Curated annotation (Swiss-Prot):
One GO BP: translation
Catalyzed chemical reaction(s): N-terminal N-formyl-L-methionyl-[peptide] + H2O = N-terminal L-methionyl-[peptide] + formate
Keywords: Hydrolase, Iron, Metal-binding, Protein biosynthesis
MF terms in GO: metal ion binding; peptide deformylase activity
Organism name: Lactobacillus delbrueckii subsp. bulgaricus (strain ATCC BAA-365 / Lb-18)
Name the UniProt record assigns to this protein: Peptide deformylase
Keyword Iron: yes
Keyword Oxidoreductase: no
Amino acid sequence: MILMKDIVRDGDPVLRQVAQKLTFPLSDHYRKLADDMMEYLVNSQDPKIAAKHQLRAGVGLAAPQVGEGVSMAALLVPDDKGEIIFKEVYVNPEIISESVRKTCLSEGEGCLSVDKVIDGYVPRPNKVTVHYWTVDGEEKAIRLKGYPAIVSGHEIDHLNGHLFYDRINKENPFALDEDTIVIY
């Protein structure tokens, strides 16, 4: 079971490296890693389990965040009522198309690997198409909009050595294009 002590923190070099692509079939080690990352997200969104194990809630977790420099990320995205609207483990994902129009979260973004609050909007494409493989080696492409697109972008950024605050406007952290969609 992944706990907060297992989450790599900002400053660790693995978070700034481009993750290595995985080959199929996945080894038992990487299949277990996928299961463990999803288990963390499920547990972190359950108030009783999260309190018992002192887990910070998460909607996505990339392999580099647990010290594994490979291209894999788990996503468990709820809507504003807490219902799960997207659940997947991406292997070797890439965003192959994105909208010009941006979106962002009204509260900004956070990250399990970043312990401090960093104020500012994190503009991301409102719509993305993600090409990836499942843990079982099935090739997929999915079009996402809004919050699932934001979470996908955040996790894929991890796999490319970027953190959310890299996208915040340094001169004016709350500046947005006038057609940016602000959600939640």
